[in-house]
Regions:
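Short alpha-helical segment of the dimerization/phosphotransfer core of two-component systems
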Residues: 54-62
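Short conserved segments within the C-terminal catalytic ATPase subdomain
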Residues: 100-110
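Short helix-loop "hinge" at the ATP-lid/N-box region of the Bergerat-fold HATPase_c
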Residues: 134-135
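Short beta-strand/loop element within the Bergerat-fold HATPase_c
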Residues: 141-153
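Acidic ATP/Mg2+-coordinating residue in the GHKL
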Residues: 161
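Short conserved segment of the HATPase_c
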Residues: 166-180
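Conserved glycine-rich
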Residues: 207-208
Length: 240
């Protein structure tokens, strides 16, 4: 039974990766043509300009989606044997997110450190996605705290925000592909709806688990538990 499920998931990943790969070129051409048309026709009517802006935004969203789907389909092939120190990585992520956090007036703070074995690129993506999500769905002037605690053979990462909270009935669903709690804010900030799904995939691939630790109208904390050593077998965690 387990072998059948693994084969089904592998086939699904292969199909998803192939579909995303085939979409990349036509989407890039669409984006280029839209940019060219906009540059050559700067004085179009307001309603046409608004329509062109909408087309560019939706094309960019589709490009982001295909990029994320390609990442997800290729995760199994990524080596996971690098030594990773998290504190410097988190500071780098804060620097990359500074334009967004400054724009929204959200303060970023970090505490703790830890060392683990895994894929540097994937763990960066995991923490980046969680932190970016916490910034996007925060209150104006809010804060995000990323903390790391190391305990013998495991490492606990927590990302806490001062946002509006996640309803209890959605706390497992948020890690499923394309699921969004607040669709209006998702439209405002773009994105493919795959950020937290990718977090779950990366965590699972490193033999860990991810969950909503607590959430209320005062904010949310998402906790990721990872083995500190070289364990890389998927945990098989259920998010249904």
């Amino acid at each position: 039974m387990l072998e059948r499920l693994n084969n089904a998931f592998a086939a699904q990943r292969q199909f998803t990766g192939n579909a995303a790969h085939e979409l990349r070129t036509p989407l890039a051409l669409m984006q280029a043509q839209l940019e060219l048309f906009s540059a050559e026709h700067p004085d179009v009517r307001p309603e046409t300009a608004e329509f062109l802006t909408l087309l560019r935004e939706q094309t960019e969203r589709l490009i982001q989606m295909t990029r994320a789907l390609l990442e997800m389909s290729n995760l199994q092939q990524v080596a996971r044997n690098e030594r990773i120190q998290l504190a410097p990585m988190i500071e780098e992520i804060f620097t990359d997110l500074a334009p967004l956090s400054d724009k929204l007036g959200v303060t970023l703070t970090a505490e703790g450190d830890g060392i683990m074995t895994g894929s540097d690129a994937l763990i960066y993506r995991l923490i980046f996605n969680l932190t970016e999500n916490a910034v996007k769905y925060n209150r104006p002037g809010g804060s995000v705290r990323v903390s790391v605690t190391q305990e013998l053979e495991k490492l606990l990462l927590r990302v806490s925000d001062t946002g509006y909270g996640i309803p209890e009935e959605y706390r497992r669903s948020i890690f499923q592909p394309f699921f969004r709690v607040d669709k209006s804010r998702s439209r405002e900030y773009g994105g493919a709806g795959l950020g937290l799904s990718l977090v779950w995939e990366i965590t699972n691939l490193h033999g860990g688990c991810v969950r909503v630790e607590e959430s209320s109208d005062k904010g949310t904390t998402i906790a990721v538990e990872l083995p500190a050593g070289a364990e890389t077998e998927p945990s098989g965690a259920d998010i249904s």
